[in-house]
């Protein structure tokens, strides 16, 4: 199972250093199935027992792109895993860069956690699968370092996860399109994680607020 933590705009370098130290000690050995996405200002240079990923980046090595992170910056911290397509980035105008980001990350051999998800109106209109398929049309579903995270927008940050029957329907559909690992994200917590992980085709979870405290993240990993 893959356990990924998106820390979003939380943690400083000092606090994430403590987070990483505790997680490293608990794990004891390197595990590529544990991924943590800290904010970029908190990136750590030292080797960890988990994969450190980037929440955002610009599809360039470097250049005249004010305020952006290029490959050169990720390389400095040994980062080879990126999050692409999160709804909070799409809402900020990231939609037009998604294909360029994917293509760049693939070209450079990055592990990619690619997020897809529908809003409540799309769900209620019965067009979820059609919508998700369209979101996936711009990427290579056979890329060997791809992970797809299904995060229904109506569940992100609301404390209310999607119904397991809805999750199962979506993951079964996605499994018919690709053989890459499939994650669920959206208000994952200690009360629902076991049920979510028991859904057929679920290969793990992308966790938000429930992973902000390292002790909670460890508890979710251990089950």
From Swiss-Prot:
The keyword Cytoplasm applies. It catalyses: D-glyceraldehyde 3-phosphate = dihydroxyacetone phosphate. InterPro entries: Aldolase_TIM, TIM_sf, TrioseP_Isoase_bac/euk, Triosephosphate_isomerase, Triosephosphate_isomerase_AS. The active site is at 86 (electrophile), 151 (proton acceptor). Substrate binds at residues 6-8, 157, 187. PROSITE patterns: TIM_1, TIM_2. It is found in: Cytoplasm. Pathway: Carbohydrate biosynthesis; gluconeogenesis; Carbohydrate degradation; glycolysis; D-glyceraldehyde 3-phosphate from glycerone phosphate: step 1/1. GO terms for molecular function: triose-phosphate isomerase activity. Coiled coil: none annotated. GO terms for cellular component: cytosol. GO terms for biological process: gluconeogenesis; glyceraldehyde-3-phosphate biosynthetic process; glycerol catabolic process; glycolytic process. Keywords: Cytoplasm, Gluconeogenesis, Glycolysis, Isomerase. Homodimer. Belongs to the triosephosphate isomerase family. This is Triosephosphate isomerase. It comes from Campylobacter jejuni (strain RM1221).
């Amino acid at each position: 199972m893959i356990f990924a933590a998106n820390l979003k705009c939380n943690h400083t370098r000092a606090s994430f250093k403590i987070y990483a130290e505790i997680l490293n000690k608990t794990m004891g050995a390197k595990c590529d199935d544990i991924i943590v996405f800290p904010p970029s200002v908190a990136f750590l240079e030292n080797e960890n027992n988990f994969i450190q990923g980037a929440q955002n980046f610009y599809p360039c090595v470097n250049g005249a792109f004010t305020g952006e992170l290029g490959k050169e910056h990720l390389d400095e911290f040994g980062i080879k895993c990126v999050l692409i397509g999160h709804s909070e980035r799409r809402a900020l105008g990231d939609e037009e860069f998604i294909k360029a980001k994917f293509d760049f990350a693939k070209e450079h051999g990055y592990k990619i956690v690619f997020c897809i998800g529908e809003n409540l109106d799309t769900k209620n209109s019965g067009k979820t699968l059609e919508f998700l398929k369209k979101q996936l049309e711009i990427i290579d579903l056979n890329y060997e370092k791809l992970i797809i995270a299904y995060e229904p927008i109506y569940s992100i940050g609301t404390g209310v996860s999607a119904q397991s029957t809805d999750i199962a329907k979506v993951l079964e559909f996605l499994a018919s399109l690709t053989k890459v690992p499939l994650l669920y994200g959206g208000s994952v917590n200690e009360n629902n994680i076991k049920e979510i992980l028991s859904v057929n085709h679920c290969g793990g979870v992308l966790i938000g607020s429930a992973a902000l405290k390292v002790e909670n993240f460890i508890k979710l990993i251990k089950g």
